[in-house]
Amino acid sequence: MLKDIYERSLSGEITIEDARKLLEANPFELFDTADQLRKEIVGDNVTYIVNRNINFTDFCVGTCKFCSFKNNKGFRLTLDEILQRVGAAKETGSTEVCIQGGLTEDMYLEDYAGMIRAIKSKYDIHTHAFSPMEVYHMSRMSGVTVEESLKTLKVAGLNSMPGTAAEILDDEIRSVICPGKLSTSEWVDVVSTAHRVGIPTTATIMYGHIETWEHRLKHLFIVRDVQRQTHGITEFVPLTFMHENNSLSGKSMGASGMDDLRMYALARIIFGRDIPNVQASWVKLGTKLAQVALNCGANDVGGTLMEENISKSAGSKSGEYLSPDDLQAMIKAAGRIPRQRNTLYKLLG
């Protein structure tokens, strides 16, 4: 274990210079340090959530070059179809629905707020919905500020937001992989404003394409800075780039397994106590590498999902659904204690 790094992480003193040096460290010492930090900060529980993803449309005016989901099937769910999916989620014990969709030219703030109101009027379930880009887009379409949109969504019943659309928080990289998407400062503004009006979010990174480790490290420190200012980030979710069926596939085959594990370890070390929850996405990594990530800093495996269209369209072979029993078995096989949680990391049962 890297004792000095361990101590400085716990006291919140890790610098970007430290992180650069850690890239040259013995990887197994790096992983062990992250694992010991995980044990100190959150213990041996590994959490999961019973939830359902609902992607309500793949129509999108966006230009993200890493996306394999846009206009793939050409669908848009009606409100009744969305409600049917929420009802099915409730019947199977879901505590959360995660709702995201493409950016359309005919949906406005009231459409998004109406969707949340309709769900909340019929079901007692946590709504985790709409990426920062969706909020930015609906605000522009409706001629209102981001803060006005977020306040309207909160009144409608929005409980939390996914911190997706972060990709790499570097405008030079963003101009290549997602031209026209909200900028780094705009992503920070949407997320920080959400926290200010009482909507917690997650935070993500989508790595393994054209960016360098320097870009990744800067991204992690931007996220840490946001958390230190707002304290509204519930978890950090590294998303390894899925390279099939998109225009970035010729530039990268994605991150190596070792780089995936370095990402989890560095996130744990850099965030320390600031963001205690680091999620290993079984959809992105597969169950076996997700188990390894649990020994490299991660303490959560995400959700049951029930349906997952975005990673699947980009070549994920990990499936769309794992039952609670499946997730518990995966966690136990990694030598850890499975615990069900809600969206805000309250343990259930």
UniProtKB/Swiss-Prot annotation:
UniProt KW keywords: 4Fe-4S, Iron, Iron-sulfur, Metal-binding, S-adenosyl-L-methionine, Transferase
PROSITE patterns: RADICAL_SAM
Subunit structure: Consists of two subunits, CofG and CofH.
Molecular function GO terms recorded: 4 iron, 4 sulfur cluster binding; 5-amino-6-(D-ribitylamino)uracil--L-tyrosine 4-hydroxyphenyl transferase activity; 7,8-didemethyl-8-hydroxy-5-deazariboflavin synthase activity; iron ion binding
Keyword Metal-binding applies: yes
Keyword Transit peptide: no
Catalysed conversion reaction: 5-amino-6-(D-ribitylamino)uracil + L-tyrosine + S-adenosyl-L-methionine = 5-amino-5-(4-hydroxybenzyl)-6-(D-ribitylimino)-5,6-dihydrouracil + 2-iminoacetate + 5'-deoxyadenosine + L-methionine + H(+)
Requisite cofactors: [4Fe-4S] cluster
Origin species: Methanocella arvoryzae (strain DSM 22066 / NBRC 105507 / MRE50)
InterPro entries hit by this protein: Aldolase_TIM, CofH/MnqC-like_C, CofH_family, Elp3/MiaA/NifB-like_rSAM, F420, FO_synthase_su2, rSAM
Domain Radical SAM core: 46-273
SMART domains: Elp3 (SM00729)
Annotated family: Belongs to the radical SAM superfamily. CofH family.
Protein known as: 5-amino-6-(D-ribitylamino)uracil--L-tyrosine 4-hydroxyphenyl transferase
Function: Catalyzes the radical-mediated synthesis of 5-amino-5-(4-hydroxybenzyl)-6-(D-ribitylimino)-5,6-dihydrouracil from 5-amino-6-(D-ribitylamino)uracil and L-tyrosine.
EC number: 2.5.1.147
Cofactor note text: Binds 1 [4Fe-4S] cluster. The cluster is coordinated with 3 cysteines and an exchangeable S-adenosyl-L-methionine.
